Structures are given as C-alpha cells and as structure tokens.
Amino acid sequence: MTKVTNWLSYSPRASVHEPAVLQIFDQIGEDWFGGSGISAKAFSDALQSVGPGPLVVEINSPGGNVWDGLAIYNMLRGRQAPVTTRVVGIAASIASIIALAGDSIEMAEASLFMIHDPSGMVAGTSDDMRKMANALDQHAEILAGIYTKRTGKTSAQIRAAMT
C-alpha cells in the first residue's frame, strides 16, 4: 500500500477489474489545532490519485465535520464505477453517512455503526444561538433523509434513532 497521509492509504489496482482501496482511519475534517483528519479536499485528491474504476473504501472513523462528510458522501455517490464501503472498525456520526455512500455496504463482524443528531457549539448573541439551532435542524433533516433513503427505514424510525 502507498501511504498518502496519516489518515489515508491507497492501493492502486492491479488491473482495471480490480478495485483500488482507500482507507479512512481518522476523523472527518481537519483538526483546527493539529491538522490531523481528512478534509473533503484531501479526499478529492486521493480519489483522483486512484483514478476511475471500482473502489473499496475501508472506514474506521469517529466522525467529525458534517460539511466535509457530506462532500465525501456526494463524491462517492457521484462515481461512475462501483463503490464498496466497508466498515472495519467504527463508522460513527458523519462517518456513518460516508459508509452509506457505497453501492455495496459491508460491516465487519466486530464493527460499530453509530448515528445521532448533529451537534455544534456557538458563542454569541441569542440571534447567533437561533441561527445555529436552525442550521443544526437543517443538517439533521439532510442526514435523516440519507439514512432513510439508504436503509429503507422510515423517517420516523430514523429520527427516533438519531435522538
């Protein structure tokens, strides 16, 4: 395997029929303090490195930034070639959304999948707090829509599981 960064390694395909492998083994979104984690931009660069063709994405991530995660989900859903997502550890929070991007979704026997309502922090005025609450509600609806579409569960079942 070729190492790209601390969070991602990839294996080039031996033939056009064999999948390339990307491993997401860190938080989603870059850490503001230490620079660890995977941004949507870095993931896009990695996708370009492996090129078109079948892809396996192995996931062991606690989740992280919703915006980066949704962009990664959309990039994977937009691929022309088949994508298999494989949870090999934990797919928590926004990493669970990325796991649902696969055309085929696999979970290892000793793996975990965790969903919840989005959360965030804000400092400021009461108007700032209301804006944040509205943004969180909007994100919750987007996430619930993906869970509903990709799992076949009802919206009510998904919303209950997220709270």
Language-model features: where?
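N-terminal organellar transit peptides
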Residues: 1-96, 101-163
